[in-house]
């Protein structure tokens, strides 16, 4: 697949529509107004917006926020985003009352100006990829740039439908970075290449395991999904989370991957999952106990493999990360990945939180901004938002 970068285009004097990911977390403050609790996604879009402005573009920004079910909802307005963007961009940001229609047409920016459209999902046509709605969006601009990797797995009007209707389309700088790192990891990674997968369910990551199994030298599995594999090996799992309907699949994956697949060799177990619950470390999960994290022997074994890697792909926690002290395995893995010196690609909210908790964010090569999109990419799926840029 070949696509253009925003850097390949002449933006001077052109209206450039940038599809960004401003799906930020909001909460009501004491005055009842919605405020942003994390502006990470806004800041992630700044390089592309600044590049467009520096090269003489009139910038139109578009995003969804939340799930307003196809109608306006003041609690999911992008107005707080416009205010925050203006602060961090240090350029005035006009806020449109809608994303299409005569009012928006009347507000179209001049070169050097920024207009933020209202939430795309206030129109049901966005998620339906409605051709007429896509045409209205396309009519706003001359150049289309997709910088919303987190929405690239959706075939919506703003990510796919309108792209065919514009004169030129390209990837933004953030999108380009995502595709560079994830593409390298899944096609031609520096070796040894190690993948670490965690999280609760095998069913969420079957395709990822199968696809990465073709590429990686070692695949380390932690989190609750490991217990389905342990059961497939005939080992006791106590009351740990097991997907019984996936045990046969786990058996076939074990046979296929052989010694390349590594599972936990010890476990942190509890009688009940509760804050402050007493725990013990065991090699074999006893009857009636629930495994909630990988144990120290597993941390050591996983860390040793990671230390010798040239590429590390990590997605998903090693235990019940949100309930300390059962976050220790995940934090230890974060430190191992950061200390490896390998090209490291991390995805998934808990893995990202673990990197922060371990204080090693600056030592990770790339933290993916797309949850579902990065998983689908790792699974080898075609992302509609990326395929639409193919030229």
Swiss-Prot record:
Which cellular component terms (GO) are annotated to the entry? cytosol
User: Mind listing the GO molecular function terms for this protein?
Assistant: ADP binding; ATP binding; phosphoglycerate kinase activity
Q: Which residues cross the membrane?
A: none
Question: Major location, coarse class?
Answer: cytoplasm
Q: Which residues bind substrate?
A: 21-23, 41, 64-67, 121, 154
**Which Pfam families is this protein grouped with?**
PGK (PF00162)
CDD domains linked: Phosphoglycerate_kinase
Give GO terms for biological process.
gluconeogenesis; glycolytic process
InterPro entries of this UniProt entry? Answer: Phosphoglycerate_kinase, Phosphoglycerate_kinase_CS, Phosphoglycerate_kinase_N, Phosphoglycerate_kinase_sf
Q: In which pathway does it act?
A: Carbohydrate degradation; glycolysis; pyruvate from D-glyceraldehyde 3-phosphate: step 2/5
Instruction: Give the SUPFAM superfamilies listed for this entry.
Output: Phosphoglycerate kinase
Q: Which residues bind ATP?
A: 205, 322, 348-351
Has UniProt tagged this entry with the keyword Transmembrane helix?
no
Q: Report if keyword Magnesium is assigned.
A: no
Catalyzed reaction equations: (2R)-3-phosphoglycerate + ATP = (2R)-3-phospho-glyceroyl phosphate + ADP
- Which UniProt key words apply to this protein? ATP-binding, Cytoplasm, Glycolysis, Kinase, Nucleotide-binding, Transferase
The record's subcellular location field reads: Cytoplasm
Superkingdom assignment? Bacteria
Q: Which PANTHER family does this UniProt record tie to the protein?
A: PHOSPHOGLYCERATE KINASE (PTHR11406), PHOSPHOGLYCERATE KINASE 1, CHLOROPLASTIC-RELATED (PTHR11406:SF23)
Query: What is the similarity comment for this entry?
Result: Belongs to the phosphoglycerate kinase family.
- Subunit structure of this chain's protein: Monomer.
The name under which this protein is listed is: Phosphoglycerate kinase
- Species, as recorded: Solibacter usitatus (strain Ellin6076)
Upper lineage is: Bacteria, Pseudomonadati, Acidobacteriota, Terriglobia, Bryobacterales
